[in-house]
């Protein structure tokens, strides 16, 4: 197989190989275990588990028994002789023992290698920026670390986590996630998490964000890290930046300086701080429904390209939907904080595996990765596992990989004459039992 179109599965297994994981464990001065459920096997099974519709521990064990991790098994006697139990106890204990720091290191390595594989020329990348919330199990430790929300009727039941993830604009590949409590005294904002997430990006990249991120603190943080921005502004902020009312379409050079409020919140900001850029104002929509769109950008791109770039921002909504619903991250069932974080990281790894297959399939058939359905490709991957595992040699394996990519490329979204529009509303669910107001 052409090295520029390397098999995504081989790349994942290479990053989680025995040598790489053992090296990371030794660097962290952690003990290297020789057993069936070694660190590399557990990480790989947790990724595969997230790709399955049910995603239970039993599906992870069954994947191991069918040979999904044969290349990662250690040299222990039980592994060599394939004396592996169908019970989930050993896998469950190994997941608990898995070092959280190791998960971070492996996932960071995966993101780096995927970025190199999908962007071999090293061109400038653009990232979509948005945040979301995830529901956690209502255990005492998680409720303390991630308090539930409160209102005039009392405290909610489920702990809630706030998360921010950068998604590469063309491929949808997710970068390292950052998260924190959404409520309580230690609650963190999406802007705070976004600033932390910027550290992993390559200087020169472009960040695309909505009005929630169209604030000076985000623009300043990106500017300090050598990143460029395209962010939407509120009408009031655009008016202040322009120095008066905006009545005509066009663009103008501006110097964005922080307000007194921005300066108070960002204590490390030097006196006289500012970010040079352009303010773009255009009318969007049709007929009487037209409205103003205000963008601030530090990217040296023509206005039409800046507008086209921001026009793709809505893709982050479907990216988050795929991450939360298709990879089943909307409610994390782990019952302690350490296991919850490991589940979150490996879920991002599973999501990126599907995105990598989509990108390679699109490249092979001269398509855009955004033209393919995430769920369709995930189903193709699940249906292809047994053929990949049973390939007798490298040539047969290569044929199966190409067969998988060809099948994935068939999952093109339909071209509708009129774009569908859905109201932001949900059907009411009737409950037979009364709502609970407190824990047992």
Where are the model-predicted features located?
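DNA-recognition alpha helix
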Residues: 56-80
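Short helix C-cap/helix-to-loop transition motifs enriched in small/turn-promoting residues
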Residues: 70-71, 100-102
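Noncatalytic, basic helical substrate-engagement surface that gates or grips nucleic-acid strands
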Residues: 87, 128-129
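Major-groove recognition helix of helix-turn-helix-like DNA-binding domains
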Residues: 74-98
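Single, function-defining residue in the core of a domain
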Residues: 1-59, 63, 95-98, 105-109, ...
């Amino acid at each position: 197989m052409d090295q520029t179109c390397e098999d995504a599965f081989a790349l994942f297994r290479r990053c989680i190989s025995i040598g790489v994981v053992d090296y990371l464990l030794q660097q962290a001065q952690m003990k290297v275990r020789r057993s069936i459920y070694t660190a590399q096997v557990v990480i790989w099974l947790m990724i595969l588990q997230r790709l399955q519709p049910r995603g239970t521990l039993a599906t992870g064990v069954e994947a191991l028994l069918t040979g999904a991790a044969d290349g990662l098994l250690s040299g222990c006697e039980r592994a060599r002789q394939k004396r592996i139990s169908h019970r989930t106890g050993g896998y469950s204990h190994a997941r608990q023992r898995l070092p959280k720091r190791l998960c971070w290191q492996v996932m960071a390595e995966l993101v780096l290698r995927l970025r190199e594989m999908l962007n071999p020329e090293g061109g400038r990348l653009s990232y979509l920026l948005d945040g979301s919330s995830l529901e956690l199990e209502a255990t005492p430790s998680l409720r303390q670390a991630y308090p539930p929300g409160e209102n005039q009727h009392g405290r909610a039941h489920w702990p809630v986590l706030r998360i921010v993830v950068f998604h590469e604009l063309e491929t949808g590949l997710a970068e390292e996630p950052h998260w924190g409590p959404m409520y309580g005294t230690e609650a963190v904002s999406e802007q705070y998490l976004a600033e932390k997430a910027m550290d992993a990006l390559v200087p020169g990249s472009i960040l695309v964000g909505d009005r929630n991120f169209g604030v000076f603190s985000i623009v300043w943080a990106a500017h300090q890290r050598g990143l460029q921005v395209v962010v939407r502004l509120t009408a009031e902020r655009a008016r202040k930046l322009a120095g008066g009312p905006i009545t005509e379409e066009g663009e103008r050079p501006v110097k964005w300086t922080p307000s007194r409020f921005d300066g108070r919140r960002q204590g490390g900001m030097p006196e006289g701080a500012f970010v040079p850029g352009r303010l773009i104002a255009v009318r969007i929509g049709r007929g009487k429904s037209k409205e103003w769109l205000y963008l601030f950008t530090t990217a040296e791109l023509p206005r039409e390209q800046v507008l086209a770039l921001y026009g793709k921002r809505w893709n982050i909504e479907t990216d988050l939907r795929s991450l939360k619903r298709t990879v089943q991250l909307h409610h994390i069932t782990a019952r302690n904080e350490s296991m919850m974080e490991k589940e979150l990281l490996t879920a991002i790894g599973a999501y990126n595996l599907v995105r990598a297959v989509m990108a390679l399939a699109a490249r092979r058939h001269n398509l855009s990765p955004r033209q393919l359905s995430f769920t369709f490709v995930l189903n193709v991957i699940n249906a292809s596992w047994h053929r990949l595992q049973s390939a007798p040699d490298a040539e047969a394996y290569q044929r199966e990989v190409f067969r998988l990519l060809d099948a994935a490329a068939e999952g093109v979204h339909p071209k509708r004459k009129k774009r569908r529009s859905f109201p932001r509303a949900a059907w009411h669910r009737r409950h037979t039992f009364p709502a609970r107001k407190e824990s047992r």
